[in-house]
Amino acid sequence: MIDKFKKYQAQTTKNPLGLEIIKAKGSYIFTKNKKYLDFVAGVSVNNIGHSNSKINNSIVKQLKEYSHVMVYGEFVQKPSVELCELLSALLPNKLNTTYLTNSGTEAIEAALKLAKRSTGRQKIISMKNSYHGSTHGSLSVSGFETRKRRYRPLLPNVHHINFNSVEDLNIIDNSVACVIVEPIQGGAGFIESKKEYLKKLRAKCNEMGVILIFDELQSGIGRTGKMFAFEHYNVTPDILVIGKALGGGFPIGAIICNQLLMNKFKSNPILGHIT
């Protein structure tokens, strides 16, 4: 199978691990002859283990009713409505409306578009050493030049500042559409925000009418001891981006904000964001 893998399926490194997985259960993955404790976890995805019976049973039950009918907010689908309701119940009152996507990087794209759409501004502030995804917009706001240099030109008007630098917040003015930040930087080695930093960032965004986006794709869904990392800081974003562990092993992402802000996607044009 490894020969067919190398012949027919694209790889992302010159020397892939090449483990032929035949089964996964709980915290373990299995090849024909070995059992491995899985510290990869689908890259921060399998938060409740492989082959979780509750997830599997839910999938089987849903497939007996229907699978795909419409991804946008047009048809009423009980599972997605109940998910959005649950997320609202877990979050502060201002984060009460959810747009579901197929992945985390799609959710980042949606958040950036919504910020530009709602403010009428183009400039975006992000952090050095940040990671937000690999599609065009999310790569543009990511802070690792080694990942970006082969794909330039990327989005214009993106400026990167030093993470946790209060002094650098002075670049935020009324020409900025949004600031996007990971409360805990994942790709940089799990670097935590300083509490005072996030509070001053929130205050600066309030002062300048700038949308504050928290990317909790890696830090969200219980990975820090609270459901969302921003809860440790008592600072609430305008837009929250989640994904990865939200699906427990299946592709999903979401942006969550207040309904007034989300309504910007309804008109001029209609279907203002299509995932």
Predicted features by range, described:
Residues 1-275:
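Conserved N-terminal phosphate-binding loop of PLP-dependent enzymes in the Aspartate aminotransferase
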